[in-house]
């Protein structure tokens, strides 16, 4: 019985993560080595701080998916930080709220927004890193 519950829980958790809108459109869970490599290569980088219970994050998800599909952002490296489970990364990047978006141009922070759900301003903010 316990094994059955464990398996069911694992399947549901995996399904939730896979279906999470923030992971759509080419986003990757934050990886320090990949982030450092992208910075060293001078790539444009977007970090989205996401929580599955956050309505603002859910509103941002289709905009971020559209952004990734835009040819202007074809070289963008897109990472997601989980607000609930990656507190060390929140401290590293000075994040205090879910729905925070941070754009980097190489190793320099180019722009940051919190709680923005307007397509034009998100595109403009991330555009500062391109």
Task: Please place each PLM-identified region on the residue numbering.
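N-terminal export leaders
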Residues: 3-8, 12
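N-terminal signal peptide c-region/cleavage motif recognized by signal peptidases
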Residues: 19-21
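A short beta-strand-turn-helix
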Residues: 27-43
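Short active-site neighborhood of thiol/selenol oxidoreductases, capturing the structured segment around
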Residues: 41-52
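Typically the conserved alpha-helix immediately C-terminal to a functionally engaged Cys/Sec
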Residues: 58-70
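Thiol-based oxidoreductase modules, predominantly thioredoxin-like and allied folds used
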Residues: 73-87
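Structural micro-motif
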Residues: 93-102
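Non-catalytic, surface beta->alpha helical segment in thiol-disulfide oxidoreductase systems
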Residues: 105-130
């Amino acid at each position: 019985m316990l094994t059955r519950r464990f398996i069911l829980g694992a399947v549901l958790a995996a399904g939730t993560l896979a279906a999470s809108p923030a992971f759509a459109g080419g986003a990757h869970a934050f990886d320090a080595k990949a982030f450092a490599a992208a910075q060293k290569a001078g790539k444009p980088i977007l970090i989205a701080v996401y929580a599955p219970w956050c309505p603002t994050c859910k509103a941002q998800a289709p905009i971020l998916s559209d952004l990734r599909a835009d040819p202007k952002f074809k070289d963008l490296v897109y990472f997601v930080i989980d607000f609930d489970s990656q507190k060390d990364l929140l401290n590293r990047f000075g994040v205090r709220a879910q729905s925070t978006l941070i754009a980097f141009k190489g190793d320099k922070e180019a722009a940051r927004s919190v709680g923005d759900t307007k397509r034009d301003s998100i595109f403009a903010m991330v555009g500062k890193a391109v």
